[in-house]
Amino acid sequence: MRHRKCGRKLNRNSSHLHAMLRNMAASLIINEVIKTTLPKAKELPRVVEPLITLAKHDNIANRRLVFAKIRSNEIVSKLFRELGPRFLNRTGGYTRILKCGFRAGDNAPMAYIEFVDRISANNSKDIN
């Protein structure tokens, strides 16, 4: 029986699923918005949000815990340098999922996942 088994399998074995979620988390941290299928987008905050919570307090232990999940020094440094201080006053809910229609090939539901306080190019004001 499947009682109390949390998370989605997404039609993959466990190593493929962990690798895919790790790569998607890295892409989300670098680009701050990605487009993916809706079930993958719903699964991604379970990976990303604990990393941002750790990045709020910059110490060597938290850096090592984040590095164990992401395995990239540049992503870890961006997480602790930019994203951690940005979300310092927010207690959770760092990501937002926006549905964006269906994929042309197989009609899969697609979604954008982004950070809530994302600084976009069209939001910035030109100061003269």
From Swiss-Prot:
<dbReference type="GO" id="GO:0022625">
    <property type="term" value="C:cytosolic large ribosomal subunit"/>
</dbReference>
<comment type="subunit">
    <text>Part of the 50S ribosomal subunit. Contacts protein L32.</text>
</comment>
<keyword id="KW-0687">Ribonucleoprotein</keyword>
<dbReference type="InterPro" id="IPR000456">
    <property type="entry name" value="Ribosomal_bL17"/>
</dbReference>
<dbReference type="Pfam" id="PF01196">
    <property type="entry name" value="Ribosomal_L17"/>
</dbReference>
<comment type="similarity">
    <text>Belongs to the bacterial ribosomal protein bL17 family.</text>
</comment>
<keyword id="KW-0689">Ribosomal protein</keyword>
<dbReference type="InterPro" id="IPR047859">
    <property type="entry name" value="Ribosomal_bL17_CS"/>
</dbReference>
<dbReference type="GO" id="GO:0006412">
    <property type="term" value="P:translation"/>
</dbReference>
<protein>
    <recommendedName>
        <fullName>Large ribosomal subunit protein bL17</fullName>
    </recommendedName>
</protein>
<dbReference type="InterPro" id="IPR036373">
    <property type="entry name" value="Ribosomal_bL17_sf"/>
</dbReference>
<dbReference type="GO" id="GO:0003735">
    <property type="term" value="F:structural constituent of ribosome"/>
</dbReference>
